[in-house]
C-alpha cells in the first residue's frame, strides 16, 4: 500500500460537548491504508496539452477527483437502529401511474442485466476494459461480507475488492475514450452475490448502466438525446429497482428507467401559450415532463428544470419523500419529489453550494459550499441552526456518521479543497444564538411558522389544480403553483457558530469524498488517494497495541470545546 509522505499519521479529535453531557468517547484514528489510484492520461485521440496555461479559455472536460461507492453483498453489519427505515410511510415514487406499473415477464423475479458485453464492446465511447486474470477465483474465494469499492477517476472507472490482500489490483478497470466519469451510485435494493446495478454519469451527459459481475452494460441518454449536459450527480431512487435520478449541469433533474429506451425529448408544455411558458420558467421547479404523464414508453420518466445554473448535488431524505438539492446559484431547495413541488428555498451566506446530506433521522440537513462554511438547517422548523466554521477553502463533501448519532447528539464530517478532514458534534441544547437577537429570532420563527401553515393550505389547493389537463393551464395556473417559501439569509451575527471537534490536514491534494463505516473513516482525494482510518477501539489506549509508529488521527478530552485539534484553524 503506497502511503502518502505527508498524510496525517494520526487524527486527534476533542470532545467539545462535555458541558452538555453529550459527545462520544475520545481516542485515536489510526491510518490503516493509503491506496493510490493512478490518474489515466488523456486518450491518444486527444491533442496533448504541450504548455498548460492556467489562464487559457479552452474548455477542458470537468473532473471530480475520486468518488467512491462501497457495497457488501453479504450480511455485513447493518446500520444502527437510529437509522432504521421502519418509519418510512411514503408511497413508492410513481405509485399510482399505471403507465409505470411493472409488467410481468417470463423471467419472473430474475434480475435483468444490461444486454451489451463491455469487454467486447465496439462502441467508440468505451476505449478499453482491463480485467484481472484471476478475477473469477478472487470472487469465489473472497469473504462475502467484505467491501467492494467502485471508484471513478477522470476517464477511468475501477472495481476494487477492499477485503483482498491485493486490493490495489482492480478486479476490472474501464477506460472511456474522452468522457470523464463524474459520479456513480449502487442500487442497494437489487444487490446480491451475483448481481450489482451501477449507474454512472459522465461529462458528456451519457449515462452507463453497468453490471460488473457479468461485465454487461447499457448506454442511456446516448449523445445527450434527453439532456445534453454533464451529469453532476446520480442516485438510485429509494425503493426502486429500475429508476434513478440524475442532476445535469444545465439545472435539470431527470428521472431515467434503466429498462427503457431513449427518445428525443420534447417538453410536454410546448403546446402552451407563450405567456404560460414564460410564467412556468419563473417557477422554482419547472415540470417539463411529469412523473404522472401517461407517455412513459421511453426515457425520461420525469424531467424538472430548477435553474439555469449547475445542480451540484442532491440527497434523498430517510422518509423517502423529500429531496434536498444544492445549486451553484447558492440555493438549497427542499422538494417533495413525490408531488413534484419545491417546499422551501434557503440561501448560502455567499457563493454556490456544493454538497448536501440528511441526518439519519431526517431532522437536519447539512450543506457545504464556496463560502468555506458548513451549515446546519432544521427541516421541521424550516430554519438555519448553525454555521460551522473551520475550513479554509471550498467544502466538497459532508456526511453524517450514523454510528455516532443518537436522539440527543449528532456527529458529521466534512472535507474540502483545503485538504482537511473535520469532525463536528452538535446537539440542539448546546447551540445558543447571541442574546441580543433572541427576541427577534423568536418573532421571525413565529412568522415563518404562520407562513408555513398558510402555504401548506395553499399547497393542498394547488395540488388539486394538477388534476387539470395540460391544455387548460394558463399563466395564472402556473403562478398558483409557486408555493415555495423563500427564506431570507440569516445574518451571521444572529446565527450560532459551531467549532469542530477535530481538524486535520490529511493529504497534499484536495479531498473530494468522505465515508463512514462501523470500524473506520474513509476519504478520497483529487489525485487518487483512498485513505482508511481505523476507529478508536474501546478499552485500548493510544499506543494501539504498542504500535506507536502507526499513522493515526487522535482524540482526547479537552473540556467544553476549548481544545481544537489544529491551532492553525484560527479563531472560531
From Swiss-Prot:
Alphabetical list of PROSITE patterns matching this protein: WD_REPEATS_2, WD_REPEATS_REGION
InterPro entries, sorted: WD40/YVTN_repeat-like_dom_sf, WD40_repeat_dom_sf, WD40_rpt, WD_repeat_creC_regulators
Keywords from the UniProt entry: Repeat, Transcription, Transcription regulation, Ubl conjugation pathway, WD repeat
Origin superkingdom: Eukaryota
Protein's GO biological process: carbon catabolite repression of transcription
Region ranges (Disordered): 36-61, 458-486, 541-572
Family, per entry: Belongs to the WD repeat creC family.
Protein name: Probable catabolite repression protein creC
Phylogenetic lineage: Eukaryota, Fungi, Dikarya, Ascomycota, Pezizomycotina
Gene designation per UniProt: creC
Amino acid at each position: 500500500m503506497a502511503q502518502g509522505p505527508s498524510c496525517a499519521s494520526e487524527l486527534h479529535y476533542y470532545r467539545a460537548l462535555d458541558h452538555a453531557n453529550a459527545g462520544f468517547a475520545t481516542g485515536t484514528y489510526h491510518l490503516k491504508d493509503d491506496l493510490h489510484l493512478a490518474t489515466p492520461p488523456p486518450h491518444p485521440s486527444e491533442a496533448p496539452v504541450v504548455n498548460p496555461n492556467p489562464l487559457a479559455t479552452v474548455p477542458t472536460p470537468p473532473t471530480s477527483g475520486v468518488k467512491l461507492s462501497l457495497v457488501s453483498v453479504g450480511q455485513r453489519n447493518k446500520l444502527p437502529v437510529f437509522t432504521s427505515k421502519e418509519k418510512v410511510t411514503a408511497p413508492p415514487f410513481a405509485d399510482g401511474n399505471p403507465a409505470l406499473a411493472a409488467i410481468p415477464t417470463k423471467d419472473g423475479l430474475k434480475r435483468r442485466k444490461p444486454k451489451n458485453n463491455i469487454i467486447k464492446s465496439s462502441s467508440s465511447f468505451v476505449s478499453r476494459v482491463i480485467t484481472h486474470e484471476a478475477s473469477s477465483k478472487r470472487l469465489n474465494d473472497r469473504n462475502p461480507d467484505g467491501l467492494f469499492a467502485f471508484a471513478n477517476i477522470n476517464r477511468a472507472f475501477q472495481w476494487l475488492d477492499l477485503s483482498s490482500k491485493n486490493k490495489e489490483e482492480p478486479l476490472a478497470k474501464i477506460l472511456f475514450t474522452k468522457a470523464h466519469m463524474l459520479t456513480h451510485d449502487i442500487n442497494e435494493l437489487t444487490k446480491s452475490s451475483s448481481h450489482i446495478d451501477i449507474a454512472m454519469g459522465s461529462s458528456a451527459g451519457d449515462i452507463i448502466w453497468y453490471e460488473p459481475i457479468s461485465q454487461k452494460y447499457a448506454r442511456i441518454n446516448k449523445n445527450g438525446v434527453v439532456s445534453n449536459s454533464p451529469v453532476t450527480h446520480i442516485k438510485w431512487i429509494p425503493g426502486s429497482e429500475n429508476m434513478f435520478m440524475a442532476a445535469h449541469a444545465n439545472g435539470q433533474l431527470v428521472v431515467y428507467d434503466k429498462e427503457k429506451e431513449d427518445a428525443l425529448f420534447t417538453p410536454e408544455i410546448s403546446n402552451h401559450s407563450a405567456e404560460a411558458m414564460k410564467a412556468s420558467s419563473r417557477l422554482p421547479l419547472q415540470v417539463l415532463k411529469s412523473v404522472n404523464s401517461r407517455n412513459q414508453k421511453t426515457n425520461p420518466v420525469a424531467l424538472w428544470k430548477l435553474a439555469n445554473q449547475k445542480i451540484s448535488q442532491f440527497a434523498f431524505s430517510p422518509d423517502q419523500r423529500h429531496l434536498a438539492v444544492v445549486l451553484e446559484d447558492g440555493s438549497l431547495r427542499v422538494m417533495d419529489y413525490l408531488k413534484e413541488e419545491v417546499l422551501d428555498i434557503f440561501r448560502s451566506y455567499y457563493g454556490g453550494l456544493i454538497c448536501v446530506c440528511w441526518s439519519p433521522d431526517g431532522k437536519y440537513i447539512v450543506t457545504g459550499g464556496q463560502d468555506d462554511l458548513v451549515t446546519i438547517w432544521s427541516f421541521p422548523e424550516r430554519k438555519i441552526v448553525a454555521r460551522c466554521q473551520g475550513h479554509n477553502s471550498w467544502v466538497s463533501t459532508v456526511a453524517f456518521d450514523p454510528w455516532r448519532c443518537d436522539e440527543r447528539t449528532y456527529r458529521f464530517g466534512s472535507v474540502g479543497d483545503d485538504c482537511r478532514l473535520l469532525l463536528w458534534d452538535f446537539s440542539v441544547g448546546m447551540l445558543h444564538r447571541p442574546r441580543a437577537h433572541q427576541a427577534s429570532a423568536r418573532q421571525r420563527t413565529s412568522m415563518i411558522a404562520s407562513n408555513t401553515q398558510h402555504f401548506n393550505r395553499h399547497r393542498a389547493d394547488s395540488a388539486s389544480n394538477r388534476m387539470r389537463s395540460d391544455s387548460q393551464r394558463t399563466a395564472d395556473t402556473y403562478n398558483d403553483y409557486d408555493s415555495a417559501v423563500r427564506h431570507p439569509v440569516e445574518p451571521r451575527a444572529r446565527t450560532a457558530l459551531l467549532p469542530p471537534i477535530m481538524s486535520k490536514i490529511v493529504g497534499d491534494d484536495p479531498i473530494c469524498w468522505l465515508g463512514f463505516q462501523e470500524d473506520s473513516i474513509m476519504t478520497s482525494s483529487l489525485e487518487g488517494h483512498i485513505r482508511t482510518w481505523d476507529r478508536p477501539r474501546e478499552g485500548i489506549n493510544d499506543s494501539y497495541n504498542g504500535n506507536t509508529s502507526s499513522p493515526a488521527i487522535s482524540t482526547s478530552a479537552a473540556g467544553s470545546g476549548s481544545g481544537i485539534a489544529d491551532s492553525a484553524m484560527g479563531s472560531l
